[in-house]
Regions:
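Domain-level signal for soluble alpha/beta catalytic cores
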Residues: 1-793
């Protein structure tokens, strides 16, 4: 597929609407009630040039099917059969089509990760049993949900698995995922092809296809919409010929699997086939670099990247106590302190007597990913603990570490391979600590060779050349540095060292550690594991990055040291850290506003209780809670914070509100409420993720939200408004077919004697459409808050 084009079909929903699909009707049930219609549509696409048709199974999940009389297996098997019937006499193949579950996964939502995996697995099992030729996971906006679906597909079938996600005009998904994070995560998890579908037309998505082709070795899929929809009539603005012309550039960028999504039909696929079938996809200009990520934070390992060492119980009594007590908030504070000090990766070690590492490591990983947005390096040799943690990690992590023993290689490398993790290879084996650089290099070569046999690319192998204590083995410092030099410069690998080991047992450890770090970076150390809370250590890294050409125009160096105020702040912070390093490392959040902004629920609740000793409840809302939420909202608008941060802050604010409510109740006072709002997803539309996010954010600004749910008739909205004397209504629609329902709801509300203000939003709603209806346009949850402030105060 890298060398020839493969043609997919176009939209199924568009064709079903053309054939009279009724508002609110579940399209997947047509596989049972009208399979000939589906077969006819599939056949039209095949006649237009389609080689792979997507079965009508996009929403055939347990959550949706529970409202019907049919099982997932009933619907999937019927849909696959209808598609296969269309392929008779042709070489076309049938893909099991899997869409999102319609509910946010934890921690942004309430759906547990393993429940999502199980729901997807049920679909996969049904598709395999029905004879699907491949699996296409599509229209994902949450990388975590895409991972759940991909794991289910890989664990329950041997079929090829393709995954496409939907990116908006910001170049990110709805949840903030970047192109590189998507590519490296899904590639590592074993996807056979990846790409983009839906959301925009080929012209708008072209820069994203170009970016994707630069960061993946996999075949790339393009299934864009027919331009952008007109919210008035639902028609898309790009005719077939123009769609096809734009797709020529998409193929030229390196895309090799092409089709269409919303608004496209067989005419589009025919025009596309005519325009590009003789083309050879452009070559991928791929940079094969080392890479770790979270969904919203891609981190290329180019130059020195600091790994924070403090999440480790060794020699840390308070940390040991926290592990034994399950005090994860303390561990989060340690993490935040390191990230604030400049750590770009966090090493995570929870191994301690009395601690169930298999249970604790994934708990800590989930908690850390809620609080900090840097990649994690999972520090354990327990294969079961690593598997449990890697399974719930969102993004591409690293495993620390695998040594040269054959047993360790055979046990740990398969786990890293399954979950797409990078591997730290420790240069020792069953013979013990090697004394020479040459011996360490030989072990490194064996580790790389073993990793490649398991399918782990060499750029995902980082070598730890061993830092030994110079006070006991002085000659070994030079051997370590020589090994680092060879591994990095001759083998071209990233190198790791636990730098502080060098100074154990010596006075003025900081000076020795700093000096060794500088020497090691000069020899090729790229991933130092250090304490970022030590100012002098981070100062050395900042200076080295300038001298090594990593800090362009000395920008980061100047920002760090460029003003007397900054220097004074650094001195004050350093004094605090050095006076009590263990305690201060965990005292990262002492400000209520900061706790809300960071989404730290426990800290926010604790600090709110403390603040009530000197402030009243209303003051907490007006001086702390609202300004903190406004700050996150502004960052969200600017594109420096994303949905996880927005929802995390809302959840922390919710914890503060609970404290305020309890305090008022104890005094016999009334709850703090700023006005009541009715929200609903309109009749015929079953999508409510966006509406639920709006509800959460509004509630945490102090508004009382009456959520009528999804698929809500206009009369129900009107009745609630009249009964509750509502002054503001929020309506959501995701599909163009449900816009008439939105219009009718607005019309009925406007006929009331004292009509409420109305705000509307959703993927298909535009500012012009909202203005035409005489409503406010709420592009997102943040905008809904601003509208509520205008209307209700």
């Amino acid at each position: 597929m890298e060398h020839k084009l493969t043609f997919l079909d176009g939209a199924m929903g568009t064709m079903l609407q053309r054939h009279g699909l009724k508002l609110g009707e579940i399209p997947e049930l047509l596989a049972i009630t009208n399979p000939d219609l589906l077969t006819n549509i599939h056949r039209q696409y095949i006649e237009a040039g389609t080689e792979i048709v997507y079965a009508n199974t996009f929403g055939a999940n347990r959550r949706k099917m529970q409202k019907t009389h049919y099982t997932v297996a009933d619907v999937v098997s019927a849909a696959i059969a209808a598609a296969k019937k269309a392929c008779i006499g042709t070489s076309a193949r049938v893909a099991l089509d899997i869409g999102p579950l319609g509910e946010l996964l934890e921690p942004m939502g309430t759906l547990p990760f393993e429940t999502a995996v199980d729901m997807f697995a049920e679909i996969v099992d049904a598709g395999v049993n029905a004879g699907a030729d491949l699996i296409c996971i599509e229209t994902m906006t949450d990388l975590y949900e895409a991972k759940a679906a991909l794991l289910a597909a890989k664990e329950h079938s041997t079929l090829p698995v393709w995954v496409t996600m939907s990116f908006d005009a910001t170049g990110r998904t709805f949840t903030g995922c970047t192109i590189p994070s998507m590519a490296r995560t899904l590639e590592g998890l074993g996807a056979d092809a990846i790409g983009l579908n839906c959301s925009q037309g080929p012209k708008q998505l072209l820069p994203l296809f170009q970016e994707l082709c630069r960061v993946t070795t996999l075949p790339v899929i393009a299934k864009p919409n027919a331009g952008l929809p007109d919210p008035v009539d639902g028609h898309y603005d790009l005719p077939p010929e123009e769609f096809a012309r734009t797709m020529v550039d998409v193929v030229g960028a390196g895309v090799s699997i092409v089709g269409g999504c919303c608004g496209t039909n067989p005419d589009y696929i025919r025009a596309l086939h005519d325009a590009v079938h003789t083309m050879t996809p452009g070559a991928h200009d791929i940079h094969h670099g080392s890479f770790l990520c979270t969904p919203t934070m891609p981190l290329e390992i180019s130059g020195v990247r600091v790994i924070g060492e403090r999440i480790n119980p060794t020699g840390k009594k308070r940390f040991q106590q926290a592990l034994l007590a399950g005090d994860l908030d303390y561990i989060v504070d340690v993490a935040i302190a390191q990230v604030d000090a400049g750590a770009q990766i966090l090493d995570v070690n929870v191994g301690y007597p009395g601690v169930d590492e298999v249970a604790m490591l994934p708990r800590v990983v989930r908690k850390l990913q809620e609080a900090v947005d840097v990649p994690l390096q999972l520090d354990s040799t327990n294969a079961a603990a690593l598997e449990a943690a890697l399974r719930v990690y969102n993004g591409k992590a690293a495993v620390n570490s695998v040594n040269g023993e054959e047993k360790a290689l055979q046990t740990l490398l398969p786990v890293a391979k399954k979950y797409g993790a990078a591997v730290v290879g420790l240069a020792l084996d069953e013979k013990g600590l090697p004394k020479t650089a040459a011996e360490r290099v030989e072990i490194a070569k064996r580790i790389v060779a073993a990793a490649e046999r398991f399918g782990i690319p060499r750029e995902d192998v980082f070598i730890d050349c061993l830092t030994l204590t110079v006070s006991a083995q002085q000659d070994q410092a030079e051997e370590t540095l020589a090994a680092v030099r060879t591994v990095h410069r001759d083998m071209g690998l990233q190198t790791v060292l636990g730098v502080s080991n060098i100074s154990f047992g010596l006075p003025n450890r900081l000076l020795m550690t700093q000096t060794f770090l500088i020497r090691a970076m000069n020899e090729g150390l790229t991933l130092p594991i250090i304490n970022p809370n030590q100012k002098e250590i981070m100062d050395a890294v900042a200076a080295f990055r300038v001298l090594n050409g990593e800090d362009e125009a000395c920008a980061a160096y100047v920002e760090r040291f460029g003003s007397e105020a900054a220097l004074a702040a650094e001195k004050q912070r350093a004094a605090a850290v050095s006076s009590a390093p263990t305690a201060k490392a965990a005292a990262a959040v002492t400000n209520l506003d900061d706790a809300i902004i960071r989404g730290l629920k426990a800290d926010a609740a604790r600090l709110a209780k403390e603040a009530l000793a000197t402030e009243n409840e209303l003051s907490l809302v007006e001086k702390h809670l609202i300004p903190a939420l406004d700050k996150v909202g502004t960052d969200y608008e600017r594109g420096v914070a994303f949905l996880p941060q927005l929802l995390g802050a809302a959840q922390a604010a919710q914890a503060v509100f609970s404290v305020i409510r309890d305090s008022l109740a104890a005094k016999g006072g009334e709850p703090v409420k700023k006005g009541r709002i009715v929200i609903a997803t309109v009749k015929g539309d079953i999508h409510d993720i966006g509406k639920n996010i709006v509800r959460t954010v509004l509630e945490n600004y102090g508004y009382d939200v009456l959520d009528l749910g999804r698929d809500v008739p206009p009369e129900t909205v009107v009745d609630a408004v009249v009964k509750e004397n509502i002054r503001l209504v929020g309506l959501s629609a995701l599909m163009t077919t449900t816009l008439p329902s939105m219009e009718e709801t607005v019309r009925q509300l406007h006929t009331l004697p004292n009509p409420p203000s109305i705000m509307v939003g959703g993927a298909v709603v535009t500012p012009e459409y909202a203005q035409k209806m005489g409503t406010f346009y709420a592009k997102d949850a943040r905008a809904s808050v601003e509208i509520a402030k205008k209307v209700l105060g």
